[in-house]
């Protein structure tokens, strides 16, 4: 998989992709992450990527020309499954979407900034608009990092223990069951006896019951689908 991220602040996320699971995925050749500075696609001496909006609205708007140049340059080199724009008013990102996008070959993620992008880009070049939550961030860079992490980590081979990834919260619209490690007792706080029993079937049953209970209590909306 290849993910191309277009941003006005590459330094904001470069470090994120050089550690932990994201670095491991790239080292294994299972994912490529390329970060593109939008200012490299400007043609004026000030390298401007924003301008005042028509209509006298507040804020600044990302200019159409550098975005179009960058996207078209990338698309001339290879085909892309999706051209994604990070925006608070997009479709809500969730595990189901991450699973689907992980099957893609190539993705472009355009990070929103300022008041937004010239809407013509959204009309003519963007294929999917995604939000990671009902709140506003300084820019779409953090959203792009969140999405890339959720997508890449479930590519087969990225995580050595694939069963661990499959049992994470939200994979079955359920929250994960509680987990424990040694010592079995600490200051009177005990690990549930069932987990020490070695009885695999009963442990699986306990895990499902705990997942259901936690989901009903903390995220009942997940059980409504």
UniProtKB/Swiss-Prot annotation:
One of its GO terms (biological process) is tRNA N1-guanine methylation. Coiled coil: none annotated. Specifically methylates guanosine-37 in various tRNAs. Its EC number is 2.1.1.228. The lineage of its organism: Bacteria, Pseudomonadati, Bacteroidota, Bacteroidia, Bacteroidales. Pfam families: tRNA_m1G_MT. Keywords: Cytoplasm, Methyltransferase, S-adenosyl-L-methionine, Transferase, tRNA processing. GO terms for cellular component: cytosol. Signal peptide: none annotated. One of its GO terms (molecular function) is tRNA (guanine(37)-N1)-methyltransferase activity. This is tRNA (guanine-N(1)-)-methyltransferase. It comes from Bacteroides fragilis (strain ATCC 25285 / DSM 2151 / CCUG 4856 / JCM 11019 / LMG 10263 / NCTC 9343 / Onslow / VPI 2553 / EN-2). Belongs to the RNA methyltransferase TrmD family. The keyword Glycoprotein does not apply. It catalyses: guanosine(37) in tRNA + S-adenosyl-L-methionine = N(1)-methylguanosine(37) in tRNA + S-adenosyl-L-homocysteine + H(+). It is found in: Cytoplasm. S-adenosyl-L-methionine binds at residues 112, 132-137. Homodimer. Gene3D superfamilies: 3.40.1280.10, tRNA(m1g37)methyltransferase, domain 2 (1.10.1270.20).
């Amino acid at each position: 998989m290849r993910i191309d991220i277009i941003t006005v602040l590459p330094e904001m996320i470069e470090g994120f992709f050089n550690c932990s699971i994201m670095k491991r995925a790239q080292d294994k050749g299972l994912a490529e992450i390329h970060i593109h500075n939008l200012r490299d696609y400007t043609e004026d001496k000030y390298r401007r990527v924003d301008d005042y909006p028509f209509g006298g609205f507040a804020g600044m708007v990302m200019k159409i020309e550098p975005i179009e140049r960058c996207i078209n340059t990338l698309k001339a080199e290879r085909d892309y499954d999706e051209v994604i724009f990070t925006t608070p008013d997009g479709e809500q990102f969730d595990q189901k979407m991450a699973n689907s996008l992980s099957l893609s070959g190539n993705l472009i993620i355009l990070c929103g900034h300022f008041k937004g992008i010239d809407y013509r880009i959204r009309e003519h070049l963007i294929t999917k608009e995604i939000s990671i939550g009902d709140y506003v961030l300084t820019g779409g860079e953090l959203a792009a990092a969140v999405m890339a992490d959720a997508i890449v980590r479930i590519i087969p081979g990225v995580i050595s223990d694939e069963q661990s990834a499959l049992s994470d919260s939200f994979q079955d619209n359920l929250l994960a069951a509680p987990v424990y490690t040694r010592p079995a007792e600490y200051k009177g706080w005990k690990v549930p006896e069932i987990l020490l029993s070695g009885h695999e079937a009963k442990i699986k049953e306990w895990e499902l019951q705990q997942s259901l209970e936690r989901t009903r209590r903390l995220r009942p909306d997940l059980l409504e689908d």
